[in-house]
């Protein structure tokens, strides 16, 4: 089974398509409000409930966390999912909103899951975020996404190779101070992009297009 973590950023019913009947759902704090648009029921609700009152619902497992703690509610949920033996976690409601620091924090949570052997995905209505660990090659078949961006998650990534994209990389270095990997696209005739890194983890962002654009242009 897969674990789905619902964080507090509001989501649209459009994301209901991502859920599976056997998903184990953990709602974090105000993230339980996302259950209604997604048409799902949480298995666990947890948080310090500083952004929403603690719900009173029958048959729900509710974990009340202290306000003073090292882990965010989403990080606590991620560790709980790992402890329960899930090998795949989808985070919804973890991107955007009025607290950009939580988006950055949730990226760190995603990488932490990967480091514990759990495949992590963060997704919203327009973008999907995944990770590539050192020594790993991941394939990204062409789906509804258009833009393909890769950034060094640990400040520097060496030996980065990317194939099937408009701007290919061969044993390249990506650094935090220069966004070389932003806004790539699938090469003409390509139905899959593969990317690998020898040293340093990557965060990969796939994004849908806004309007028809000219291939080969970077903003």
Predicted segments — roles?
Residues 127, 132-219:
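Long, charged alpha-helical interface segments
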Residues 62-84:
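Short phosphate-binding loop-to-helix
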Residues 100-111:
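Short Gly/Thr/Asp-enriched flexible loops that form oxyanion-binding sites at enzyme active sites
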Residues 6, 26-29, 47, 64, ...:
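General beta-strand structural signal in soluble alpha/beta enzymes
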Residues 60-67, 117-121, 146-151, 156-157:
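A glycine-rich helix N-cap at a beta->alpha junction
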Residues 1-55:
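N-terminal beta-strand-loop-alpha-helix module at the start
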Residues 112-128:
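Short, acidic/small-residue loops that bind anionic groups at enzyme active sites
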């Amino acid at each position: 089974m897969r674990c789905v973590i619902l964080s507090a950023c509001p989501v649209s019913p459009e994301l209901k398509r991502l859920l599976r009947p056997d998903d184990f759902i953990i709602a974090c704090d105000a993230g339980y409000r996302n259950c209604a648009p997604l048409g799902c029921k949480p298995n666990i609700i947890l948080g310090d409930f500083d952004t929403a009152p603690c719900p009173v619902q029958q048959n729900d497992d509710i974990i009340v966390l202290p306000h003073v703690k090292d882990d965010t509610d989403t990080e606590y949920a991620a560790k709980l999912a790992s402890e329960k033996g899930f090998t795949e976690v989808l985070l919804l409601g973890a991107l955007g909103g009025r607290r950009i620091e939580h988006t950055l924090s949730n990226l760190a949570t995603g990488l932490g899951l990967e480091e514990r052997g759990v495949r992590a995905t963060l997704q919203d209505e327009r973008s999907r975020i995944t990770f590539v660990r050192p020594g790993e090659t991941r394939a990204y078949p062409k789906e509804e996404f258009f833009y393909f961006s890769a950034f060094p998650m640990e400040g520097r990534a060496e030996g980065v190779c990317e194939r099937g994209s408009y701007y290919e990389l061969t044993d390249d270095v990506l650094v935090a101070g220069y966004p070389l990997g932003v806004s790539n696209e699938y090469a003409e005739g390509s139905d899959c992009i593969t990317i690998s890194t020898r040293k340093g983890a990557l965060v990969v962002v796939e994004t849908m297009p806004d309007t028809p654009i000219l291939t080969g242009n970077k903003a």
